[in-house]
């Protein structure tokens, strides 16, 4: 996204799907990471969850969330207190509702200038055989 620095605003919203049993708590944990360590901590935490999540339906173990927070440099007890308090659950629920209201029914879902793009797209497809974000964003910036 460095190509679009200063031109594109990149925003992420939580939309944990119910069939991923740990997704809602993982979303809360990511919000706790952001509260305690800012954007950098959010992205480190978020990216590590996705790197380590198994695709066999079990996801990322909930008991690994606090150690992961410590691993990325967050205060372990502050993170645990935030996560255990459930204070991020309303934020996650609100983001899910906003997504549903905007037509999101699954992930990934992306909006470019308010237009919903459902499903995964490559950033760039030099063959132009499929839609890609670069083409969509470049058109929106014209």
Regions found by a protein language model. Give the residues of each.
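C-terminal cap of thioredoxin/glutaredoxin-like
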Residues: 1, 63-142
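Structural alpha/beta surface segment adjacent to cysteine/selenocysteine redox centers
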Residues: 1-70, 138
């Amino acid at each position: 996204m460095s190509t679009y620095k200063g031109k594109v605003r990149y925003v992420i919203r939580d939309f944990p799907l119910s069939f991923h049993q740990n997704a809602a708590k993982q979303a809360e944990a990511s919000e706790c990471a952001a509260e305690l360590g800012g954007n950098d901590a959010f992205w480190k935490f978020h990216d590590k969850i996705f790197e380590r999540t198994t695709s066999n339906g079990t996801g990322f173990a909930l008991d690994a969330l606090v150690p992961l927070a410590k691993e990325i440099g967050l205060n372990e007890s502050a993170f645990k207190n935030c996560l255990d308090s459930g204070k991020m659950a309303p934020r996650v629920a609100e983001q899910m509702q906003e997504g549903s209201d905007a037509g999101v029914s699954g992930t990934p879902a992306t909006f470019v200038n308010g237009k919903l793009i459902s499903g995964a797209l490559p950033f760039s497809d030099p063959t132009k055989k499929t839609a890609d974000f670069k083409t969509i964003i470049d058109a929106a910036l014209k």
